[in-house]
Amino acid sequence: MTTSVRTRFAPSPTGFIHLGNIRSALYPWAFARKMKGTFVLRIEDTDVERSTSESVDAILEGMAWLGLDFDEGPFYQMQRMDRYREVLKQMQDEGLVYLCYMSTEELDALRERQREAGEKPRYDGTWRPEPGKVLPEPPAGVQPVLRFRNPLNGVVAWDDAVKGRIEISNEELDDLVIARPDGTPTYNFCVVVDDLDMRITHVIRGDDHVNNTPRQINILRALGGEPPVYAHLPTVLNEQGEKMSKRHGAMSVMGYRDAGYLPEAVVNYLARLGWSHGDAEIFSREQFVEWFDLEHLGKSPAQYDHDKLNWLNAHYIKEAGNVRLAELARPFFAGLGIDEAMLAQGADLTAVVGLLKDRASTVKEIAENAAMFYRAPAPDAESLTQHVTDAVRPALADLAAALKAVEWTREAIAAALKATLGAHKLKMPQLAMPVRLLVAGTTHTPSIDSVLMLFGRDVVVSRIEKALA
């Protein structure tokens, strides 16, 4: 019987979650969906001092926004302490761990001596029981840690789905602390128990965990388990070539939503940030799941490219429905000084979005470009002097009169403009520029007939006539 694929995303809720972090959710999610398996969310919150509920909320919100639904969880490590203690007791009973009374000061001094001798700093096994070995007397008043009896010889090996065959000599590994003096278990121990209990078959995570892997494999095997398939993803770099982080200016996942990016664009971009399917750059979520495999995960660090994300987002904005985009654009108007009442009184927002979306890289940009439809024009004096000249005023007056009478369609407006140009022997920019300026307050708009149609006859005519009065 084939074992069902079970993957997991196991973030620590200690603050910021950026694109590099959430990629470690996207790939295991996609693999689980591709293999018709199970995707588990586990919150590794044993760092009590740094873990916050706000960070948990940010993780859940980011996953929900990107559509990374999980089948089981969220499981919180702090709620599994009884289970960890049960396994620790089992390991003590089986002689897999031992009490170590070496103080932090003694350990620091030991490591310093090793460094001075040119040796790799490591615990020397002072308190490790061995046949015929006499252990020191436990010092009074010292709470011991629990250390795992790592194998003394042999190698730990695994075939990493990204990095290939990795072999680590057990002589390189010291006996890991798996429970602190107060009895609380450590990270590497909790991860192993969780992966075992949750029957995780594939661990897809950042390559900053590679050094933890041999230790985790040894603990896993001591508990009678078999290692999952590991796929260690190379780091995501920012545009300056540094590891992506808040300190180096990375934006949070939800920051992209708040900047006007569409979730499907971010998912598409993230998918290509360390994985490829031939030369395909644009693909749907469904296509991504169908194509995704571990064999085509990149082996080199991926570098974030903001221009490429903007290009992808512009593509998805063009493809998106106008009603949806209008709703997504609404929250951005408040920051532009435009309230709901002003939106209601101005041009139809859905139609405005339809006109402007082909020129925008973000939904926020759509709102910024749409603002002219919802507030009074305020052209600068220099532009007025340049474009609204005495020579063009008669043409503006005739155009206003013509627009009062025509059917209010884009074609009829275009015909009125063309007739006015012919009557006054003007070129289109000579008339369109002042009209744009007087009606919209700017010379930068899409096609003049489309813009005027959305402003509406009353607004267009009154603004031109007011300027001529």
UniProtKB/Swiss-Prot annotation:
Coiled coil: none annotated. GO terms for biological process: glutamyl-tRNA aminoacylation. Its EC number is 6.1.1.17. ATP binds at K246. It is an enzyme of class 6 (ligase). Residues 114-139 are annotated as: Disordered. Residues 114-131 have a biased composition (Basic and acidic residues). A motif ('KMSKS' region) lies at residues 243-247. GO terms for cellular component: cytosol. It is found in: Cytoplasm. The keyword Protein biosynthesis applies. Keywords: Aminoacyl-tRNA synthetase, ATP-binding, Cytoplasm, Ligase, Nucleotide-binding, Protein biosynthesis. Pfam families: Anticodon_2, tRNA-synt_1c. Catalyzes the attachment of glutamate to tRNA(Glu) in a two-step reaction: glutamate is first activated by ATP to form Glu-AMP and then transferred to the acceptor end of tRNA(Glu). Monomer. NCBIfam families: gltX_bact. Belongs to the class-I aminoacyl-tRNA synthetase family. Glutamate--tRNA ligase type 1 subfamily. This is Glutamate--tRNA ligase.
